[in-house]
């Protein structure tokens, strides 16, 4: 969610393979940890002349077999998509020479989160879903990649429950205006002039029937323990994520005070029908996060005046500092299915390298498995974050990267590391 200054000038890629100096660290009062550098080959599964990427870090791009990997294909990477720019939705067949199989095209996509492309829970062997636009209206489709059969849903989707029964979504047009790089262009926003609409916010979509209803409005969110900075501010939601059993969700509630250069953030949680809304964090900063289980969230966020990784417990004021001295910067953090490791990354350092990190949960060694050059020309909304994603068996990692001059997808085999 952070950005750096750009200019695409060269190709560069660097792995480090020597053992790094031990970095002493206390992890929330637990045992000392260390940082190691252990090179893992980043193998491209896409190539030119077109660019390819998947999108965000909280979804698994592989099918149930681990053979097919979802991807978007685009002809450019150096500007924001316009309303008439289509991305090709497709599959990468890793058992057939990484052949890209186009399935459809979409006008509803962005650089940071793609088109919310994912395999449907419970049908990861054949069903995918993604967002589209017709005229000024966004919607989503569920596609059977075997038969080609397509079912249309009346709203775009943001997050899907673990059982595949419902989804949560928001206003992608509002998001495009308030947070470029995360929403979609070309859509209609009936509430554009309303700074905290009572009829817009988070909608729940029944994935069997397509029925959708508003469960948490922006007006209601703004009325929860309001702050002085909210007066006359424009409000929006971003980064919805449902917990591991579908019983709660988290969302970032953001607002920009009039005349302010940046926004403020707090994190809300609620039941899947919008009930029992709770302010989980209200210290102004919350970035990337993942649910550890049905109650706890790992996030790079502020707890008091400290910005660091914290483990928050839902519906409490508990926030435990995590990875002190080891996980030192914001990154796109996620857990594998067995919850034994944390996968994360960094933003570009002084050498414009992004580091890809595995960290043994909770408090074991940090292993830096790769460093990837970030082309200066790709910055702000067009930047290419690694957005690392786990395979379903927790043995591979997929990333988007432009370290070789094009935006492509790479896979790293981490089985030997995570087996330790």
Regions found by a protein language model. Name each.
Residues 2-21:
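N-terminal secretory signal peptides and thylakoid transit peptides that target proteins
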Residues 45-51, 103-110, 213-231, 369-380:
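Surface-exposed loop and turn segments in beta-propeller and other repeat-based domains
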Residues 56, 86-127:
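Blade-loop segments of beta-propeller domains
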Residues 60-68, 115-127, 159-166, 241-248, ...:
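Blade-terminus and WD-like Trp-Asp/Gly-His loop motifs, strongest in beta-propeller folds
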Residues 72-85, 172-198, 253-263, 347-348:
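Short, conserved, GDST-rich strand-edge loop motifs in beta-rich repeat architectures
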Residues 116, 131-201, 218-226:
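Asp-box/WD-like beta-propeller blade repeats and closely related beta-sheet repeat scaffolds
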Residues 323-332, 366-387:
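Conserved blade-ending motifs and adjacent loop-strand segments that build the rim/top face
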Residues 325-361:
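Loop/turn-rich, solvent-exposed surfaces of beta-rich toroidal or solenoidal domains
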């Amino acid at each position: 969610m952070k950005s750096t200054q750009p200019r695409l000038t060269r190709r560069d890629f660097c792995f480090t393979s020597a053992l790094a100096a031990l970095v002493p660290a206390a992890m929330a009062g637990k045992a000392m940890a260390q940082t190691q550098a252990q090179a893992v080959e980043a193998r491209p599964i896409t190539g030119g002349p077109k660019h390819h990427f998947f999108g965000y870090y909280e979804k698994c791009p592989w099918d149930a077999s681990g053979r097919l990997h979802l991807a978007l294909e685009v002809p450019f990477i150096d500007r924001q998509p316009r309303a008439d720019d289509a991305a090709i939705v497709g599959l990468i067949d890793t058992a057939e020479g990484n052949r890209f199989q186009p399935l459809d095209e979409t006008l509803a996509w962005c650089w940071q989160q793609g088109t919310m492309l994912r395999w449907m829970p419970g049908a990861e062997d054949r069903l995918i879903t993604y967002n589209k636009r017709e005229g000024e209206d966004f919607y989503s489709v569920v596609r059977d990649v075997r038969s080609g059969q397509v079912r249309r849903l009346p709203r775009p989707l943001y997050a899907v429950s673990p059982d595949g029964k419902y989804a949560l979504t928001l206003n992608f047009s509002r998001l495009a205006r308030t947070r470029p790089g995360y929403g979609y262009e070309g859509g209609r926003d009936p509430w554009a002039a309303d700074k905290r609409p009572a009829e817009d916010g988070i909608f729940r979509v029944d994935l069997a029937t397509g029925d959708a209803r508003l469960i948490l409005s922006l007006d209601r969110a703004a009325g929860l323990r309001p702050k002085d900075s909210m007066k006359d501010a424009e409000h929006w939601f971003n980064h919805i994520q449902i917990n591991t059993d579908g019983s709660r969700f988290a969302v970032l509630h953001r607002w920009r005070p009039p005349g302010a250069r940046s926004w403020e953030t707090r994190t809300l949680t609620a039941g899947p029908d919008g009930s029992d809304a709770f302010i989980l964090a209200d210290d102004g900063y919350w970035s990337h996060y993942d649910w550890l289980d049905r109650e706890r969230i790992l996030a790079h966020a502020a707890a008091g005046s400290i910005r660091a990784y914290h483990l928050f417990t839902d519906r409490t004021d508990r926030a435990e500092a995590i990875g002190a001295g080891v996980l030192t910067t914001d990154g796109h953090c996620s857990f594998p299915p067995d919850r034994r490791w944390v996968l994360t990354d960094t933003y570009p350092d002084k050498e414009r390298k992004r580091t890809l990190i595995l960290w043994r949960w909770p408090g074991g060694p940090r292993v830096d498995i790769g460093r990837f050059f970030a082309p200066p020309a790709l910055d702000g909304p067009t930047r290419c974050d690694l957005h690392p994603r786990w395979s379903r068996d927790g043995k591979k990692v997929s990333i988007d990267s432009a370290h070789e001059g094009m935006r492509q997808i790479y896979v790293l085999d981490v089985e030997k590391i995570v087996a330790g």
